[in-house]
Curated annotation (Swiss-Prot):
Catalytic residues, chain numbering: 96, 165
Entries under InterPro entries matching the protein: Aldolase_TIM (IPR013785), TIM_sf (IPR035990), TrioseP_Isoase_bac/euk (IPR022896), Triosephosphate_isomerase (IPR000652), Triosephosphate_isomerase_AS (IPR020861)
Organism of origin: Prochlorococcus marinus (strain MIT 9211)
UniProt name for this protein: Triosephosphate isomerase
UniProt: substrate binding residues: 9-11, 171, 204, 225-226
Lineage of the species this protein comes from: Bacteria, Bacillati, Cyanobacteriota, Cyanophyceae, Synechococcales
Family according to the record: Belongs to the triosephosphate isomerase family.
Gene3D superfamilies per record: Aldolase class I
Locations listed in the record: Cytoplasm
GO cellular component terms, semicolon-separated: cytosol
Protein origin, superkingdom: Bacteria
Molecular function, one GO term: triose-phosphate isomerase activity
GO biological process: one example: gluconeogenesis
UniProt-listed CDD domains: TIM
Major subcellular site: cytoplasm
Amino acid sequence: MSKTVIAGNWKMHMTCAQARDFISAYLPLIKNVPKGRELVLAPPFTAISTLSEILKGSNVSLSSQNVHWEDNGAFTAEISPKMLLEHSVSYAIVGHSEPRKYFSESDKQINLRAKSAQANGLIPIVCVGETIEQRERGEAERVIRRQVEQGLEETDKKKLIVAYEPIWAIGTGKTCEANEANRICGLIRQWANCPEILIQYGGSVKPGNIDEIMAMSDIDGVLVGGASLDPESFARISNYKVE
């Protein structure tokens, strides 16, 4: 696994036609991305098959936006690791704040998803983060530590990514100060008890702040939302500059 992972989460955006147009514009802009910098896109499930074909031989990997812990069964609206592997998917996002919030996903369920992903050769991107209310009450560190310890239980921490996404910064235009994001990512590394673990930052990442974010010592990549929907914007993020 690369030491730096730049991932774009499209959420519930992009038809197959729009995904094709995006890739046509994006790929020419990332030809000179430095070696060792992994680029990842997490499209909606409907576009995975299309992108799997288009991206063959490129320097872009695919991620799913979720994955179930069973290989098959009566789990309406879910998708299994084996289904994803058929389409050359390499990563799986689990524990994003939106399914945590809207579908009441627990740390136990997220842990099951992460373990299932690893057991099938996928690299889980385990999302953690606090709400603004939790931060204002001084509970941020306790909440994130619980998510890390329970979400990563019985996993191989050298073969996964933790994405720190303060919920109050997702899609709001508010960005956690780079030094504070770096501090939390450093704590996550301690709580995981694995110096080699890869940690991303997510939360209103955009071309204007990517260079500062990636200059931080404990941040190994980013998980990008809205800014990953525009090929030029995501290309600038992919080509971030190192001082």
